[in-house]
Amino acid sequence: MTEPSVSEASGGATHKDVVCPYCGLGCDDVTLEVSGTAVEAKEGVCGRAAALFRRGAEPAPSARVNGREAPLDAAIAAAAELLSHARSPVYAGLGADVDGVRQIIKLAARTGGSVDHYASTGLFRNLATSQRRGWIATTLAEVRNHCDLFVVVGPDPSEQFHRLYERVTPKTGRFLAGPRKIVFLGGAPSEEARAQLEGSTIEIVAVPEGELVEALSRLQALVSGLVPPAGGVELAPLAEALKAAKYAVLAWNAGGLGADGDLVIERAVAVVETLNVETRAACLPLAGRDNLIGANQTFLWNVGFPLRTGFRGGIADHDQAAYAGASALKSADILVWVSAFRPERPPASDAQIIALAHPATEFEREPEVFIPVGQPGLDHAGLAFRTDVVVSVPLKRYRDAGLISVAEAVRRISEGRS
Amino acid sequence: MSALRIANGKVLDPANGEVGVERDVIVVDGKIADAGSAPASVETIDAKGGIVMAGGIDIHSHIAGGKSNIARLLMVEEQRAFREPQGPFCGCGGGLSTMTAHATGCRYAEMGYTAVFEPAVVAANARHMHTEMADIPFLDTGGYLVLGNDDFLLDLIASGAGQQAVNDYVAWQLNATKCMAIKIVNPGGINAFKFNARWMQLDEKNPHYEITPRTILQTLIRAVTELGLAHPIHLHGCNLGVPGNEQTTLDTIAAAEGMPLHMTHVQFHSYGTEGDRKFSSGAAKIAEAVNKNPNISIDVGQVMFGQTVTASADLMSQHRNRGIASPGRWIGMDIEMDAACGIVPFAYKDKSFVNALQWAIGLELFLLVEDPWRIFLTTDHPNGGPFTTYPHLIRLLMDRSFREEQFAKLAKSARKHSNLLEIKREYTLEEIAIVTRAAPAKILGLTDRGHLGAGAVGDVVVYREDADREAMFSRAAYVVKDGTVIVREGEIVDLVYGRTHQVTPDYDASIETKMDRWFDETIGYKAGTYKISDEEIRGGQGSVKHATVRAS
């Protein structure tokens, strides 16, 4: 456990510079007050993270097997027993730190079955372009210092990435000559986003519902020096601004885009590609709650494929459609649901459920095995990746509520199987 | 006490002057011991008819990190084509030029390598790099930290903060990122690309900081010398892959002014502009300069034909190369006021004039550089080709008639432009042992590796003698890692993990406040979060911290 910076007479402790693991921005200026097992987040934290960090003083719930309280060992044994008969297990949720994902890979390789993260829709929209065509992307500190024109494509990402503008496009940047220009293309900033953007110039380019792909195609034509057909949204000023910018960034929250998100991203990437022939520009593709990016990275270096990978006979294969959690679950007999960062409910299905889950999870249907797990960055140390993929942040331990980590639980289930 | 006797083999240990000496090698508790010190009962490996060497050391191989993951993502067809089946000691990975962590350890170990160093740790990605390297079995690893494009350093130099401030910063970064050496990639050029410069010559000024690659190089050479790092600056120079860059390379050798400098993947920096296609071999000139300058060492970055993927921090160069991507996709990233990366898939073809000549240029360098202690066997994995091609490369170096057969297959236009046939040299087994073990250990300052003298780590390899040197070096008969037999008759038989090498030079503590401020204001998160703790390296176990002059 890290040394608290301030000890309080009450026996509680205040921890400063705590890393927040939830949305993927990796803020590390959170203050936590911990008293016994009770946790309250103070300065630095955004509203959503405050709710997710909060813990009461009550003891952690016991593990359960078929709805009855059971010792941890019995629950581990029950999970191992269920998995030893599994024909088609699905590992989903995957809200775990890197160590947890490493252990899940090892177990899935032995039991067979597919693995996906519950929030991977946006990631795969991004991969649809990056994997097939590629892109030029950038990281948070580059945007912060170089980016003079920040174009938000589609809905305001700060809905998911609460402190996005405060962190990534603050008022000043090392290489900025004047105020930063923020353009919302096909979306609009919330009041809170506007507050974070104070000091920057905000512009909104409205795009009618469903016409974002078309707008980006026109923008691409304009930055290429072509003349798009008349009509539609007036984009010539934006095209000129992009060409004149020193370092333009097109950013989007892939998970927040509509059904045509794949195409929106492809067109936005094409705009950046064209700009880079003469000037500098980059994409900031946002995705990444609950260590989604870390799970994907851990898969790539251990398995060679991204998430949505299936194991059969010890051989892995990747299929974005077939191994997506929702479609794989249709033919699953066992769902191993992992959610250590928040009390996310497993999706409805006919499968038996082994839940390695946040203690506060409220299930629609009682799982066959419930093992309450600790949260990386609160109950145990761990590692999570930021949304920009390059930076990963160390998560520390701040309390002892007697909760086992996902990695430890999976390792013990794995041993119980053999 | 655990002990192992490797009996009846011929010991090839150039660092200790042993060439084919018939003697037993004894490993006690993971270290090489004197012949007399073996306990009575000891596990014995019969190495009769075999050549016994120290474990192989790869000085430059891109085995981990963000750029490797991007390469895996881009090369999903390769991942499908090369799967590693699940087995008692095998993971579920795959790939060839994009090999996964477990497979990387296995394939290197089977060839007799026990230490492989990652030459491009971008500081912002160091934590990922170490986490991934910990999943590579069998191998000792370590990282070279990429500096020379980081805004903090360029600002220090540009503002005239002085050598001492630079030294403190370099030492701070080495401690924070747990690396063992300093790499420079296209000094100042990656940074300049962020300000839209497309080229960077040795004496050209960065558009923002107005300092030149020469200044950056000389400042960092001085820093590692004054900090007392064993490994000199590991340099990927300016103008990678550009015809005519031989002059840049010669100028860079001169710019070192006699100070130690390691120049990496020099094949990609040895191009002239002669001939009807304005592309020619500069190998003879470069080799001559290396021969004349004992402060210079090089690794080759040999090109091997076939599909691979090029992965580099040099986004300026990779953006230029994007048009030749094959398959036609590529990814670039600017990274954290620190560096960048560019990943471009590429297939080297023997019928391509340029690729065939690149192949010949690499071999010319190997054969024309006279001192085997200053040249190292690399393909710059995966940039020139995957490391699994090393046995083939060894055969090309050792077997002149084989080399000439391969040469005959090249594009005719390239054959006309190469003098390779005029070079009669064949590497001896001793020279192979030098360029793959003894010399890398020496240039990295790993005094207890790369040789079989008493006290060295118990990394020992037995190769069966075979006139076909490619077959001989493809699968070792036995590989011993820290005293444990990990390969027997070419098969993995155990699973062990290596150590992470790092240096921890001392620095003036007053830099901490400067770094805190830099991270708070510029980078946007805390320096305290950025710094990697000892516990994060292999769970706090298995670091090797090497001494430096300015030690804490």
Predicted regions mapped to residue ranges:
Chain A
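Non-catalytic alpha/beta scaffold blocks inside enzyme catalytic domains
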Residues: L127-T279, G304-P306, G310-S418
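Flexible, glycine/charged-enriched surface loops at secondary-structure junctions
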Residues: E278-L286
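N-terminal, charge-rich interaction modules
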Residues: G12-A13, D17-D29, L257-G258, L286-G304
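N-terminal export/assembly segments and adjacent metallocofactor-ligating motifs
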Residues: M1-L219, A254, E415-S418
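Residues in well-ordered beta-strands of folded domains
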Residues: E33, A251, L284
